[in-house]
Amino acid sequence: MTLCAVVMTALLSQAQVTTSPNPLQEDSQNVVIFFHADQGNKGLANLPASTAVYAHTGVNVVDASGTEAAWKYAPKWLDNAEKYRLEYVEPNVWKLTIGDIRTYYGVAAGETVKRLCFVFRTADGKKEGKGTGGADIFVDVLDSGFQLSLSNGLTAPVAAVNSSITFTAATTQAATITLTVNGKQEASKQNVTELKVPYTFAAAGEYKVECKAVAGGNTQTQAMTVLAVSSATAATDKTIPPLGLTRNADGSYTFCMAAPQKQSCVVIGSWNDYQASSAGVCEYVDRMIDGQPFRYFKTTIPAGVIKGAFSYYYCVDLTYNVGDPYARLVLDPYNDKYISASVYPGLPEYPQGKVPNNTFLAYHSDTMLDYDWQCKSFTAPDKENLVIYEMLLRDFTGTEGKAEGNGTVNKAYDRLGYLKDLGINAIELLPINEFNGNISWGYNPNFYMAVDKAYGTPADYKRFIDRCHELGIAVILDVVFNQADGCHPWYQLYEPGKNPFFNLNAPHAYSVLNDWNQAYPLVGEQWRDMLQFWLKEYKVDGFRFDLVKGLGNNDSYANSGSAATEAFNQSRIDRMKQLHAYVSEVNPDAYFINENLAGAQEENEMAKDGELNWMNLNNAGCQFAMGYQSDSNLNSMNAKDAGRTPGTTVAYLESHDEERLAYKQDQWGVAGVKGNHAVSMQRLGSAAAQMILMPGSHMIWQFSEMGNAQTTKSSNGGNNTDPKTVSWNLLGDPDNNGLMQSYRQLIKIRLAPENKELFSTTIQPFGNSLSGWAQGRTIKTTAADRELYCVINPNVTGAITVPVSFRLTGNDDYWVASKSYGSEPAFDVAAGTVTVPANSYVVVTTRNISGVKDIPAADAAAWTVSVADGSLRVAGLTAPAYIYSMSGSQAGVLKGDGEVNVPQGIYVVRSAGRSVKVMVK
């Protein structure tokens, strides 16, 4: 049998980890692992004997179906149980006593162990001993009985011309072992358990190494191919192709990898079962950018060798095995196995055992990005009039009542009817490009141009965006440019402190992962290419940029303290202008939203460039919601009252980073709020009115409109990124549903086209007074013959009557366009007053201002709805009718007159731009 890939993984670990016995088998006894800390990444080199060193260890197993799973039975990170502690042997040598493999790891019956997996670390995890480039360490485990292993000490199936290595063959019992290279016998010995064969690669090319062991009539064989390469040669064609993979007109494929300071690069792929070949050897092109040298490696593989669908990786400098930073899809050896076929049908299986270091693979299919767009033309809403719904796909849908993190983009698609009825006109998706793991917020990116498969396929994402556009909803992507996960290829390609792409230490105060060197030209090129790719390929409508404070040049921060990070920073302004220019090259009207949360001077400079800036009013919103007057001023919902250029902020009460208002009400609300659910929901609606009815764009964090009260924080105050309970059943509670209806009404008023001038950012002054308490708060805006007055009663007890200067004379000239659920406000035009119960709000407008009311079937104009015996009938249709439950699920579609059987409940019927809400009993 030939186990080339198993051999390669054994080779990687041999110098860094040795074993007794060698080779290992499932039934080996008294197993001891020896860790050589001065090999690999040398992260634990030269530690004193007194240091507590631990192994984070698991196993790769194959189950009865033949499926291989990686890193099973590993403990939680930083488990310092005694069984994982290593014993000091001598300088840079430590040992871990395992004994019986299956017992040590607790391997289940029916599973076969294929590899041991290791990351060595200090007790606090701040130092790690890993493979070269930060790779995990793997040791092969052979089946029981007579077995043969073959290794060579290389970190990849590539070696340098004129280099000498030693091939080591080991058997589990005495045997005759013979080794040949390209058909020529190099050595043979009888009655041995090990054969070492030194070998020098005299010329470039492919070397097929074969080994045979014979014992007692049993024969085992192993084989591997080693590609010997010289340092790369300069390409005669100095053209630099697009980074990543390009399919050419003749069916060939060109690969291009940027790797400054490197000497060689070989692309290795599935087209020949991950054997390195001469066709994958790259040439290089050098160029200078701003006086700095840069190197690009490229090769073109003919159509006859490679076609259709394949996966690949790069071996750089014979040492570093990395994926493609520009991959459009990634195969993950650790997490793909947890993605079900219902989420990603036909997901290619990671080739366990065939790729060194469990390297992430780039996957390409000529058709994987194909999609037939249905919405051929979409006009995005004006950037000053956005009501954005911030969505984490993971938790937006999934198993109701459970926190399983199994939401998907297709399940979100099925809820778009709910969001359309809610009235929002933009969705901001938390990061959806490939991030580490499947359960995440996505702020740990590793491949910026690949969708994360945990939520669905590329076509699923496109279908979601397409449908949003059909519904008039823009789609904004949250992107993370300040940091990357350790799986990013450019992070793995260099040793710490020698990486031009990443800073060894972040220059700013808010770093979490690996900090990008923003001024490095190739980093900027990556951002340009990434932004333009998503605009063109997925037709997104803009971006929200995470932690803009971390996007300054290294020398722009006086130090890494918070004060220096918060200070005005011209380089951040310049960088965001450059990124905006990249976006504008594709779509001049694309949204460009900064999470900067900096001073007015810096943000107003960004605003001059047409950028929007987040405005965080969570603290004030929480104070108001809980019933505290102090620090509850919400006037900054209007940009001009925050010292910002009018119309240039996205102001919000909640975001993924902030605590839920409802949670704080439950925990710390004043008497009369805490423990009073109806009052709490009314106050949340009153807070929403102070946000939505102010000029400029605003944002709703998912389920704020339902009064979701799940905490988003850990006990230490940091973000809790664990899955949250899916709680669509909140809409079954009258008070929560009433809050949602308040949001719906307010958004309808805010975004109705005929009301646009009421909320124009050019109105000076806009009549908002949102800092008072005892005497109430008010919003007043007029335009031509339209008037809108919103009165909010912050008091926990007692109604208030507030003077209002109505311009018309009769009560019949006005109506209540929106009010808190369960409240009974009143207005008297002659007296010039509005009376509002405690905790509540009311919006009084002239009757020519659109609001939201239940539309009786008789008033449905071109088509009518009737209900009888559990069915819902629609007549007079001129366009398809879509029926949605109040939870947003699609209950049916009628392409012509007809009926749909539905359970009892409230439904929205939508057709030809008109919506009708009916109750089925």
Task: Briefly describe each language-model feature range.
Residues 11, 853-921:
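C-terminal outer-membrane/trafficking sorting elements
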Residues 15, 334-335, 370, 374-386, ...:
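Substrate-binding/active-site clefts of carbohydrate-active enzymes
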Residues 47, 51-110, 123-133, 245-249, ...:
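Aromatic-rich carbohydrate-binding modules that target alpha-glucans
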Residues 191-206, 899-903:
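Solvent-exposed segments in extracellular or luminal domains encompassing
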Residues 227-266, 323-385:
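Basic K/R-rich, polyanion-interacting modules in nucleoproteins and related proteins
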Residues 539, 562, 566, 573-713, ...:
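Conserved alpha/beta catalytic core and glycan-binding cleft of carbohydrate-active enzymes
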Residues 830-850, 907-912:
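C-terminal beta-strand-rich structural cap/linker in extracellular carbohydrate-active enzymes
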